[in-house]
């Protein structure tokens, strides 16, 4: 997986509230103190007998495919695990302008099950005396870095702003653009 090479190591799987409820994925904590309001649920692995530790790229990919399977049941997942599902707001980026909601909106627009996979990309740093050099963004890749990464690897890159603009153009104005929470994940 490209993500396991260039990300922070934390792979998340945005899902709709309906999927989270169907698969019995409760919030990780009762009182969410995340500054961006990211709705982390309990972590999962696939319950498929082929899964070993759950940490391999194959095991994590299977957990993500299970979350996106419309036929999946709660018993198809083990808890805790190595993938963290994130519960999107019902209104998508119309309600919260975060990566979680954008992922679910992209899946919906593609005609797919509203469950995706995201990971925070990190800036490449030099290792000096065993310590990674970190940029001013705590090593996290921001907009310009993501655009460069996309060009380097031949990947299409779309910003949340691009998605909002597209939705306004094709589905009408957002109900309350100013009221939408500006999230991160």
Q: Which residue ranges define each predicted feature?
A:
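Catalytic domains of riboflavin
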Residues: 1-185
């Amino acid at each position: 997986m490209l993500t396991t090479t260039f990300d922070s190591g934390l792979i998340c799987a945005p899902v709709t509230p309906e999927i989270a409820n169907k698969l019995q994925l409760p919030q990780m904590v009762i009182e969410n103190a995340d500054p961006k309001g990211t709705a982390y649920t309990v972590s999962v692995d696939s319950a498929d007998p082929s899964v070993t530790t759950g940490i391999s790229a194959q095991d994590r990919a299977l957990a993500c495919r299970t979350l996106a399977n419309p036929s999946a049941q709660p018993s198809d997942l083990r808890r805790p695990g190595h993938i963290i599902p994130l519960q999107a707001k019902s209104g998508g980026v119309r309600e919260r302008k975060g990566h979680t909601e954008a992922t679910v909106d992209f899946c919906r627009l593609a005609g797919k099950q509203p469950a995706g996979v995201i990971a925070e990309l990190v800036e490449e740093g030099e290792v000096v005396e065993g310590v990674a050099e970190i940029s001013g963004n705590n090593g996290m890749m921001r907009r310009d870095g993501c655009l460069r990464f996309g060009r380097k690897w031949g990947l299409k890159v779309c910003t949340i702003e691009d998605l909002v603009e597209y939705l306004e153009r094709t589905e009408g104005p957002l109900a309350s653009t100013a009221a939408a929470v500006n999230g991160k994940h």
